[in-house]
Amino acid sequence: MSIHISAKKGDIADKILLPGDPLRAKFIAENFLEDAVCFNEVRNMFGYTGTYKGHRVSVMGTGMGMPSISIYARELIVDYGVKTLIRVGTAGAIDPEVHVRELVLAQAAATNSNIIRNDFPEFDFPQIADFGLLDKAYHIAREMGVTTHVGNVLSSDVFYTNMPERNMVLGKLGVKAIEMEAAALYYLAAQHHVKALGIMTISDNLNDPTEDTTAEERQTTFTDMMKIGLETLIAND
């Protein structure tokens, strides 16, 4: 048991999907896992362990933002021995070539957060995905026929910004989308020598506000991302 997770040792698999929304974790467990058992309800941050195609995997919500995912991911790694973590979440497109319901695989994550700078104030430490996971996820997505973009994302501490034009400049530099967690997850993976990847479904297009999705759609309909995440988790077994 850790401070924020009530599971016992052995309750959590060494491979886990991390949606931000705990209800998306519940949806994944109920619709993709067999014999799923809930291992955490603390703060309603639901976590489940079951099997997917005969492989033991877990799924747990992380909440919104880098402070929240940093708490849960660290405890999963340090207290429960998780070795592979894949974030499955949503993002807003800023690259004009990226559209709603398409996928982004976060090759690297820029950030405006001070979480990493707190440790490295003199320079910028690059947050990068595990290449093996990235490569597997890309080929699985291609085989499934899912439109998928690979590139950098911005992990932002700010959801409602007063200067959106600054973010849009990044789109012109090839940054695919804005989200709020990947940089912190990648930094934790680097610290603890584990594997991490961010897979995001585009839920909003900041270049075209008419492209959007409902809260219910974000919770339950992004199944391609969920399947790709699960298939990537078990690809090494």
From Swiss-Prot:
<dbReference type="InterPro" id="IPR004402">
    <property type="entry name" value="DeoD-type"/>
</dbReference>
<dbReference type="GO" id="GO:0004731">
    <property type="term" value="F:purine-nucleoside phosphorylase activity"/>
</dbReference>
<dbReference type="Pfam" id="PF01048">
    <property type="entry name" value="PNP_UDP_1"/>
</dbReference>
<comment type="function">
    <text>Catalyzes the reversible phosphorolytic breakdown of the N-glycosidic bond in the beta-(deoxy)ribonucleoside molecules, with the formation of the corresponding free purine bases and pentose-1-phosphate.</text>
</comment>
<feature type="binding site" description="in other chain">
    <location>
        <begin position="87"/>
        <end position="90"/>
    </location>
    <ligand>
        <name>phosphate</name>
    </ligand>
</feature>
<feature type="binding site">
    <location>
        <position position="43"/>
    </location>
    <ligand>
        <name>phosphate</name>
    </ligand>
</feature>
<feature type="binding site">
    <location>
        <position position="4"/>
    </location>
    <ligand>
        <name>a purine D-ribonucleoside</name>
    </ligand>
</feature>
<dbReference type="GO" id="GO:0006152">
    <property type="term" value="P:purine nucleoside catabolic process"/>
</dbReference>
<feature type="active site" description="Proton donor">
    <location>
        <position position="204"/>
    </location>
</feature>
<dbReference type="InterPro" id="IPR000845">
    <property type="entry name" value="Nucleoside_phosphorylase_d"/>
</dbReference>
<protein>
    <recommendedName>
        <fullName>Purine nucleoside phosphorylase DeoD-type</fullName>
        <ecNumber>2.4.2.1</ecNumber>
    </recommendedName>
</protein>
<dbReference type="InterPro" id="IPR035994">
    <property type="entry name" value="Nucleoside_phosphorylase_sf"/>
</dbReference>
<feature type="binding site" description="in other chain">
    <location>
        <begin position="179"/>
        <end position="181"/>
    </location>
    <ligand>
        <name>a purine D-ribonucleoside</name>
    </ligand>
</feature>
<keyword id="KW-0808">Transferase</keyword>
<dbReference type="InterPro" id="IPR018016">
    <property type="entry name" value="Nucleoside_phosphorylase_CS"/>
</dbReference>
<feature type="binding site" description="in other chain">
    <location>
        <begin position="203"/>
        <end position="204"/>
    </location>
    <ligand>
        <name>a purine D-ribonucleoside</name>
    </ligand>
</feature>
<feature type="site" description="Important for catalytic activity">
    <location>
        <position position="218"/>
    </location>
</feature>
<feature type="binding site" description="in other chain">
    <location>
        <position position="20"/>
    </location>
    <ligand>
        <name>phosphate</name>
    </ligand>
</feature>
<comment type="similarity">
    <text>Belongs to the PNP/UDP phosphorylase family.</text>
</comment>
<keyword id="KW-0328">Glycosyltransferase</keyword>
<dbReference type="GO" id="GO:0005829">
    <property type="term" value="C:cytosol"/>
</dbReference>
<feature type="binding site" description="in other chain">
    <location>
        <position position="24"/>
    </location>
    <ligand>
        <name>phosphate</name>
    </ligand>
</feature>
<comment type="subunit">
    <text>Homohexamer; trimer of homodimers.</text>
</comment>
